[in-house]
């Protein structure tokens, strides 16, 4: 199961008592701020949670798995996430969930 933006907004509505529209707008604004910072080349640091970083990957050789043909994989910029120590500890110490 995955946590969705709609579920985040519902949790804000339930825990903070703000109306559902404001909760939805707050969640959207939060993610828009992260996207905007990353688009402008900034690192995003969320204390106690982790960091979103940008990495530039060089062009490299690849292979089409269907045909075996060699093809170049273009240089690109990717987003990486590194969890913070607090998040790592909480996840490591949590009980496994059966799927």
Curated annotation (Swiss-Prot):
GO biological process terms held by the UniProt record: DNA recombination; positive regulation of metabolic process; regulation of DNA-templated transcription; regulation of translation
DNA-binding as UniProt keyword: yes
Coiled-coil features, chain-numbered ranges: none
GO CC entries: cytosol
MF terms in GO: DNA binding; structural constituent of chromatin
UniProt-listed Pfam families: Bac_DNA_binding
InterPro entries (alphabetical): Hist_DNA-bd, Histone-like_DNA-bd_CS, IHF-like_DNA-bd_dom_sf, IHF_alpha
Domain of life: Bacteria
Keywords in alphabetical order: DNA recombination, DNA-binding, Transcription, Transcription regulation, Translation regulation
Cross-referenced SMART domains: BHL
Gene3D superfamilies, alphabetized: IHF-like DNA-binding proteins
Entries under PANTHER family matching the protein: DNA-BINDING PROTEIN HU, INTEGRATION HOST FACTOR SUBUNIT ALPHA
Family: Belongs to the bacterial histone-like protein family.
NCBIfam families hit by this protein: himA, PRK00285.1
Primary role: This protein is one of the two subunits of integration host factor, a specific DNA-binding protein that functions in genetic recombination as well as in transcriptional and translational control.
Subunit structure: Heterodimer of an alpha and a beta chain.
Protein name: Integration host factor subunit alpha
